[in-house]
Amino acid sequence: TYAEVESFGVGQSATAVYTAPGDGRDLNITIDADGGYVIHMDYRFDWGGNPSTGKPWEDILILNSKPAQTWGPQQHVNNFYFTPGTHVTLGDKSNDGHFAIIADGIQVATYDHRLPVNSVKEVKFSTTAGSGTDIWDLLLLP
């Protein structure tokens, strides 16, 4: 699911309203610009390796940008959990110099702008095939 954007700037937000996946699949929201990702929010139920424990990360929200062909350093929001099958919201609001990352109406993180927010062209919501995630709405708010 995606929405093309004519303009996007400070004070605007992009939010997905959906049913939380019940089988551990990932889902993400990406705000695209010309030739890169302004912000990519990726929820992972079970992912990679945590160097502190040697086990996979669990219930983590990964924030990142991709200015050109290379991803930047990741920012993690640990212990990020949605109850499977529940109706939830995940989004961001562009503030002066950073995004406020908001889940179910609560700010869970901030993420510094790495690309100009006025370069945004598209907002995408996607999930791993077969996850049982139903998108209810993709909201772009002034």
Swiss-Prot record:
Keyword Translocase: no
Activity: how regulated: Cytotoxic activity against L.infantum promastigotes is completely inhibited by D-galactose. Inhibition activity against biofilm formation by S.aureus and S.epidermidis is inhibited by alpha-lactose. Hemagglutination activity is inhibited by alpha-lactose (MIC=100 mM), beta-lactose (MIC=100 mM), lactulose (MIC=100 mM), bovine submaxillary mucin (BSM) (MIC=32 ug/ml), fetuin (MIC=16 ug/ml), porcine stomach mucin (PSM) type 2 (MIC=8 ug/ml) and PSM type 3 (MIC=8 ug/ml).
Residue intervals of the Galectin domain: 1-141
GO biological process terms on file: aggregation of unicellular organisms; defense response to Gram-negative bacterium; defense response to Gram-positive bacterium; defense response to protozoan
Keyword Chaperone assigned: no
Classification via Gene3D superfamilies: 2.60.120.200
InterPro entries: ConA-like_dom_sf (IPR013320), Galectin_CRD (IPR001079)
Temperature dependence: Thermostable at high temperatures.
Keywords, alphabetical: Antibiotic, Antimicrobial, Hemagglutinin, Lectin
Industrial or biotech use: May have potential use in the development of new treatments against pathogens that cause Leishmaniasis.
Quaternary state and interactors: Homotetramer.
Name of the molecule in the record: Galactose-binding lectin
